[in-house]
Amino acid sequence: MLPLHLVHVLYPIGLIANLFFGSAFTIQWFLSERRKKACVPKSFWILSSIGAVMMIAHGFIQSQFPIALLHGANLVIYFRNLNVSSSHSLSLRATLFILVVTLLLTTLPFVLGSYYYPNMQWMASPNIFHLPLPPPNIYWHIAGCIGLFTFSSRFFIQWCHLEINNRSTLPALFWLVSFIGGFLAFLYFIRTGDPVNIISYGCGLLPSLANLLIIYKKSRLPEFHNHSYFLSAGEPSGDILGSDLLHNIKTCDPTIRCFGVGGPLMRKEGFEPLIHMEEFQVSGFLEVFFSIFGLFKKYRRLYKAILQENPETVFCIDFPDFHFFLIKKLRKCGYKGKIIHYVCPSIWAWRPKRKKILEKYLDTLLLILPFEKDLFINSPLKTIYLGHPLVKTISNFQYCSSWKQQLSISDQPIVALFPGSRPGDIFRNLQVQIRAFLASSLAQSHQILVSSCNPKYDKNILDVLEKEGCRGKIISSTFRYQLMRDCDCALAKCGTIVLEAALNQTPTIVTCLLGPIDTFLAKYIFKILMPAYSLPNIITGSIIFPEFIGGKHDFNPEEVAAAIDILAKPKSKEKQKLACQQLLDTLMTNVVTPEECLRIICSQNSHLHLEKGILKNLHPRDSSV
């Protein structure tokens, strides 16, 4: 249709088009190798669309009708892949209409060209280097057409996959057809001496082979270890939840192997720790910053262990920031098992965008707070409200009246201090709590007992007591419920311990002294501004327990001491206890039973087969999985 010299001058358009195709497949291959699974970024379709437009022009210029026609059809499919996730997604009928119109518009110039130029070829052989090649016979042309149509049919396969699944992905059949069709076309263009298409189809064989290899390796992953669960709990509160979960799983099937990250309570249930929970005990920006290298090493060790062991289900218990990194890595590396997160991150308080991460990577989210269910009403993520496990744990707690004699504690009235579970928290909060006690009216009539969550932190507590010139005794956390029930009032660091105090109906004041950097981040960067910060106050929507939370300029020990004096009055104590009973009623409403929860989880996991008799024998101490 065009003069021969102009055809040769414009020949590089095809080369430039192949640069776009090559870039698209290079990006796709790189991301697939990185994520260990075949994936398709949006840039793949954009670059392919640009390349297709240029190849249509190349087909017109070089009088190669099959090239122009097939790239025209592919262009519509590229557009459909870009359009599928938009808010104005085209219907299948509209896409078919655009496809037919595109094919007609592509064919029309060749029909008109044949009318005005009877000698025009529809499949010319450029041979711009004038190689001494005889014209290919009819069989070569047939083989070439079969190769081209087979190669181009890959996107029709992908299109069908897209419309069925409503997801822009490249199935294994796409890559297989790409390789077979591309190989036939590659041989054909070698025979015709067409360098653009030799480069195009020759290079196209590489990503096809690479993706077929990735899919093959993924298919060769070992089957799930039928009696293997991975659990990870990085905090003491998570250790409590994890031990309850383990107890119910082991009651259901004692042969299941459970391994991962856990604390002393989980280890008592027969848990196999890869890393002890105590190694994760950091809080606040500075502590996390200086521990980042160690945390990264643990993260690498854990995800490699999971991929190697390939357990059927991964349970991540609280500790969301660390677990989010782990969950994302597992999915990117092709882990196909179920991922269940136990305890919803506080998206209702800050960083609400984490909800999208939960929906994208999780199979099930187990909730322990009653109001969290409302956050996922219109969400595709499966959620189960189990109720808080502390409710059943505390209701089944057997009080021992002789605990004071066992620990040689006098009958003097008690003020209980719960400074926290991490060294930094203990140092900051215990100072405030001791000073508040000494400034209160109870200093002369009461003794203070400090609850210690770990014996290795006892020296930290003794150092603070000595520094503040205060006599006090350290009580192991195993006696914390006896302590809560026998004390006149408690000062507790904001956290799970406050909810425990509320469920024990202990008159309590909440303290949480933050470091300067954490205070700045909370106030001005993350802007965590809420009417209340402790769980009892959040759940009930009222201030049951007075809160003193912030930096050193936000409150002082004298203010806390004034709150102690108010709380010491009988009417204040009774008011708190009544509110705590209302809190308990709220937590026990619409709770899913252990039987129901296990049945839901088992419906997702093939190896756990629950018999009615087994379910009836679940230990009564736990109302939450």
Swiss-Prot record:
Condensation of UDP-2,3-diacylglucosamine and 2,3-diacylglucosamine-1-phosphate to form lipid A disaccharide, a precursor of lipid A, a phosphorylated glycolipid that anchors the lipopolysaccharide to the outer membrane of the cell. It catalyses: a lipid X + a UDP-2-N,3-O-bis[(3R)-3-hydroxyacyl]-alpha-D-glucosamine = a lipid A disaccharide + UDP + H(+). GO terms for molecular function: lipid-A-disaccharide synthase activity; phospholipid binding. The keyword Lipid biosynthesis applies. Keywords: Glycosyltransferase, Lipid A biosynthesis, Lipid biosynthesis, Lipid metabolism, Transferase. Residues 1-224 are annotated as: Unknown. In the C-terminal section; belongs to the LpxB family. This is Lipid-A-disaccharide synthase. InterPro entries: Glyco_trans_19 (IPR003835), Lipid_A_biosynth_N (IPR011499). Pathway: Bacterial outer membrane biogenesis; LPS lipid A biosynthesis. It is an enzyme of class 2 (transferase). Signal peptide: none annotated. Residues 225-625 are annotated as: Lipid-A-disaccharide synthase. It comes from Chlamydia felis (strain Fe/C-56) (Chlamydophila felis). GO terms for cellular component: membrane. Its EC number is 2.4.1.182. GO terms for biological process: lipid A biosynthetic process.
